[in-house]
Amino acid sequence: MLELKFVRNNPDIVGRALISRNMGTELIDSLLEYDAAWRECLIEGDDLKHKRNVVTREIAQLKKENKDAASRINEMQGINSRIKELDDKIRDYKSKINEIMLSIPNIPSETTPVGKDENDNPVVRVVGEPREFTFTPKPHWEIGESLDILDFERAAKISGQGFAVYKGMGAKLERALINFMLDVHTRQGYLEVFPPVLINEKAMTGTGQLPKFKDDMYGCTDGFYLAPTAEVPVTNLFMDEYMENLPVFLTAYTACFRREAGKHGQDTRGIIRNHQFNKVELVKFVMPETSYEELEKLTLDAEEILKLLKLPYRVVSLCTGDLGFSAAKTYDLEVWVPTQEKYREISSCSNFDNFQARRANIRYRTPEGPQFVHTLNGSGLAVGRTVVAILENYQREDGSVEIPEVLRPYMGGAEEIRKVCH
């Protein structure tokens, strides 16, 4: 969340930021209107409360002198009535202001490229060369079904479309990747945590999922939401706290839940975009002056997984029109998917400046007074999409799949996945 005072004093800066995000400036116009009315009511209310104190003393003095205080009492009643009216308006305006403030996205960093959509995202670097196949590669869902390691039919039977059952070596591959990713990241200096995935509304608001993305979330009847990403519970671990000993680096595995499956035509099959998926997350809490340096390091930490798996990928810098709601700057890691002949997102690494920390009230102490920390996070990585990349990039002509060398110790020494005849 932005600071109200900043928006009030810099409407042009905020307005330009919204325009760069393909938004209008109506939110700012409404905010300034409510803010002016709110402050006007505050001033009038303070003046009337001061006047009420004066009249109260006058009434007391008149009664003490046995004089008629009726006119002053009538005046007091009018003052009290107006104060109540103003208090109601103040609450109403404040509610409207808070609602708008929660709906205003972060201001993009000066280093975030300006653009309209993903077509304007510049490529930062390309790592590895896409494999040249001597046969026609199969899509991951065909590989998974032919090897009997992915079952979409039975998943649909119990949960509907947009789910998958991992079986045998498929389940082992998923589990191996989670453990491998966590091991790599803990060696990089991240502390592993295992948080709840049922999240309350306050925490969801703290990281920016609510109110804007409510329709994309799975809500429960008792006020909880299923975590759409481990970013939410991990960042909110320090909600309403003063943090000591910055920086703090955390990594976590969780299942994630989103309603987005089926929104993208080419992803209606397979496991690229499901309602439920696993992800390993990286989260950093840092001092403001180091946050952009830490973003570069976090991105490299996420990239390390792809390098160790020897998967070809590229890094792109998201432009203003493609930037997430809470982010000031984002790098996307995109892995090569052979059957689509293009790179697909497998991680987003973002610096949120103090946007999330202000919403979640995460601060640290300085000699000048309390300050909001800067938060960063990134996927390290989306596990299902990593399975997609392995199945497609490591497939063989005979239908088997080679297991990346770094994963073999996590899979009992197995070097390949072949269909098991029961």
From Swiss-Prot:
GO BP annotations, alphabetical order: selenocysteine biosynthetic process; seryl-tRNA aminoacylation
EC number from the UniProt entry: 6.1.1.11
Pfam families associated with the record: Seryl_tRNA_N, tRNA-synt_2b
Cellular location(s): Cytoplasm
GO molecular function terms noted in the UniProt entry: ATP binding; serine-tRNA ligase activity
GO cellular component: cytoplasm
Top EC category: ligase
Residues at which L-serine binds: T229, A230, E231, E281, S379
PANTHER family: SERINE--TRNA LIGASE, SERYL-TRNA SYNTHETASE
Domain notes: Consists of two distinct domains, a catalytic core and a N-terminal extension that is involved in tRNA binding.
Family: Belongs to the class-II aminoacyl-tRNA synthetase family. Type-1 seryl-tRNA synthetase subfamily.
Function according to Swiss-Prot or TrEMBL: Catalyzes the attachment of serine to tRNA(Ser). Is also able to aminoacylate tRNA(Sec) with serine, to form the misacylated tRNA L-seryl-tRNA(Sec), which will be further converted into selenocysteinyl-tRNA(Sec).
Stated name of the protein: Serine--tRNA ligase
Originating organism: Methanosarcina mazei (strain ATCC BAA-159 / DSM 3647 / Goe1 / Go1 / JCM 11833 / OCM 88) (Methanosarcina frisia)
